[in-house]
Amino acid sequence: MAKTYIFGHKNPDTDAISSAIIMADFEQQTGNAEATAYRLGEVGPETQYALDHFNVTAPELLNDDLADQNVILVDHNEFQQSADSIADAAVQHVVDHHRIANFETAAPLYYRAEPVGCTATILYKMYKERGFEIKPEIAGLMISAIISDSLLFKSPTCTEQDVQAAEALKSIANVDLESYGLEMLKAGASTKDKSVSDILSMDAKSFNMGDFVTRIGQVNTVDIDEVFARQEELEKEMLEVSANEKYDLFVLVVTDIINSDSKILVVGAEKDKVGVAFNVTLDNNTAFLPGVVSRKKQVVPQITEALTK
């Protein structure tokens, strides 16, 4: 049987890494012994905390050419967020919880997308539907992904299905959701030792919005001011990256995981449209967005609408 490559998006977060591992386990239980998890970037400290806690090894970094290779995508579908050779791959499955855009295949495929807070929640449902065993480490990764994507159930993207999945899994993983979740989020929230490049790339995605290409990065922190103390450096790097990658707009969303608010930093020719999107006036390229924590639900749709009016 040919190998099946399974991976999440570039600049992977906890859901992207965890869901690749989980999906590989799921596929192996179906009899696909060659299903193998990979990653499209470095493992962040939050994700590493989860992997270490449940004694799971991170997937290998994908360097292979995927031309004519069997592929399963998790936690994304847009080709610009995927492997560089994805257009030449044979995409077999997609399991995702995001919008569908810039995606097409030459052949039919299994596609499962649900409006829930986390890909791991969908995978949990798939295990239950098939009656597959959920091992403790798999349960732990599912919980970690759900907590990460939902900011410990505070994000507006979090659904009752996400909460129910985490509650059902906690006894298998042997964790207290609140205490484990807070420690995991804190592990990824410090920016003191991160370079400007790290901050901008650790959880960044590119989006085609009408005629514009927009880069939106997000960093979770317990101290927004700590990040914005380096605003000048951040802006310089954002402008350089935008020039090199031809981004029309670069938005950095700095999210306070304790108070559930965000402050944004915006550069690019279309930056005034961001002010329109959130009904705010940018002050020194920044704006405070109370209650905004979700890129998927509270940032991407709003900016898309402003850019495509």
From Swiss-Prot:
UniProt: Mn(2+) 2 binding residues: 15, 75, 97, 149
One GO term describing the cellular component: cytoplasm
Cited Gene3D superfamilies: DHHA2 domain (3.10.310.20), inorganic pyrophosphatase (n-terminal core) (3.90.1640.10)
Catalytic activity: diphosphate + H2O = 2 phosphate + H(+)
Coiled-coil region(s): none
Matching SUPFAM superfamilies: DHH phosphoesterases (SSF64182)
Keywords for this protein: Cytoplasm, Hydrolase, Manganese, Metal-binding
Enzyme Commission number, as recorded: 3.6.1.1
Alphabetized Pfam families for the sequence: DHH (PF01368), DHHA2 (PF02833)
InterPro entries the UniProt entry points to: DDH_dom, DHH_sf, DHHA2, DHHA2_dom_sf, Mn-dep_inorganic_PyrPase
Chief place of localization: cytoplasm
Cell compartment(s), UniProt: Cytoplasm
Cofactor note: Binds 2 manganese ions per subunit.
Family: Belongs to the PPase class C family.
The protein's name: Probable manganese-dependent inorganic pyrophosphatase
Species of origin: Staphylococcus saprophyticus subsp. saprophyticus (strain ATCC 15305 / DSM 20229 / NCIMB 8711 / NCTC 7292 / S-41)
Organism taxonomic ancestry: Bacteria, Bacillati, Bacillota, Bacilli, Bacillales
